[in-house]
Every structure is written in structure tokens, then in C-alpha cells.
Amino acid sequence: MKIAIGCDHIVTDEKMAVSDFLKSKGYEVIDCGTYDHTRTHYPIFGKRVGEAVANGLADLGVCICGTGVGITNAVNKVPGIRSALVRDMTTALYAKEELNANVIGFGGKITGELLMCDIIEAFIKADYKETEENKKLIAKIAHLESHNANQEDPDFFTEFLDKWDRGDYHD
């Protein structure tokens, strides 16, 4: 099984710990970045994880930022992605079993590495429990998706990053 994983600069160490754990369990990890602590932007890496899963390069995805809120929102903008921000086993299992989530997100500064690893392993092993009710819920969620052709442009974030480099945006 292939797992795409991505993060922002705040939780690079946590992502590497999760990646190492997944590899130790025999999973193939597709590391979508970031790879160091240089200031960056979580939407870039949420999009990369989402695209890897949506395009079939990965079976599931894991996104991590400081709180998990930003990167989970970003990955959910990729058509075909159903991601849940999780901090406990119950939420992760519900997301997979009832809503067929294909990505989970974490706040790496909120949820510890060991707990993240336990939750991810349970998420991977859980099966979607297809029922008529679940299928209808997922169809309703999918109906909300909007497709933005600009997202497919490899330079989607270039203008934003150029403005950042010029100092137009600040934390």
C-alpha cells in the first residue's frame, strides 16, 4: 500500500517520524514535502497529497501542519478527496468506515507522534462499511465539490509565492 504524506515547515520532524514508522510497517511512502524547516505554505503540500491520492499514485494520504486545520482544509479542496482532521482513534475510524475518507490530517503540535502513528495504522487497517446510507452521504459530499481548472496548473501558487517573496504578505 502506498501512503502520500505532506506537511508544512512547522512539523517536518513529526512528518519524518511518521514516515519512518510507516516504512517500518512495510508501507511505501510518497513524501510530498516539505523536506526541511524553511518557511513555506501548507496549501502547497495539502494539494500535493490530495493529487497523489486522487490520481491513484497513492492509496491513502496523511497531512500534518501545526494544528491540522489549514492543511486539512487545503487537501479537501482537491476533487475526490474526503479528508478528516483527527486527534483520536474514534474519529479516524468513523472517517474511514462511514465516510470512506482517503486522507487524514493531524495537528503535529497537538497530537504526539506515537499517537499519530497508532491512529494512522488503525485508519489504514480499517475498512469502509458500505451501506445505502453511507453511499448517499458520500454522494451528497461529492455533489458539493467544485472543479477549478486553475488547480491543475503546476504554477497555481506561483503568484502567491512571488508576493510572499516581495514581502506583500506577513505571518
UniProtKB/Swiss-Prot annotation:
<dbReference type="GO" id="GO:0050044">
    <property type="term" value="F:galactose-6-phosphate isomerase activity"/>
</dbReference>
<dbReference type="InterPro" id="IPR036569">
    <property type="entry name" value="RpiB_LacA_LacB_sf"/>
</dbReference>
<comment type="pathway">
    <text>Carbohydrate metabolism; D-galactose 6-phosphate degradation; D-tagatose 6-phosphate from D-galactose 6-phosphate: step 1/1.</text>
</comment>
<dbReference type="GO" id="GO:0019316">
    <property type="term" value="P:D-allose catabolic process"/>
</dbReference>
<dbReference type="GO" id="GO:0019388">
    <property type="term" value="P:galactose catabolic process"/>
</dbReference>
<dbReference type="GO" id="GO:0009052">
    <property type="term" value="P:pentose-phosphate shunt, non-oxidative branch"/>
</dbReference>
<keyword id="KW-0423">Lactose metabolism</keyword>
<dbReference type="Pfam" id="PF02502">
    <property type="entry name" value="LacAB_rpiB"/>
</dbReference>
<keyword id="KW-0413">Isomerase</keyword>
<dbReference type="GO" id="GO:0004751">
    <property type="term" value="F:ribose-5-phosphate isomerase activity"/>
</dbReference>
<comment type="similarity">
    <text>Belongs to the LacAB/RpiB family.</text>
</comment>
<comment type="subunit">
    <text>Heteromultimeric protein consisting of LacA and LacB.</text>
</comment>
<dbReference type="InterPro" id="IPR004784">
    <property type="entry name" value="LacB"/>
</dbReference>
<dbReference type="GO" id="GO:0019512">
    <property type="term" value="P:lactose catabolic process via tagatose-6-phosphate"/>
</dbReference>
<dbReference type="InterPro" id="IPR003500">
    <property type="entry name" value="RpiB_LacA_LacB"/>
</dbReference>
<protein>
    <recommendedName>
        <fullName>Galactose-6-phosphate isomerase subunit LacB</fullName>
        <ecNumber>5.3.1.26</ecNumber>
    </recommendedName>
</protein>
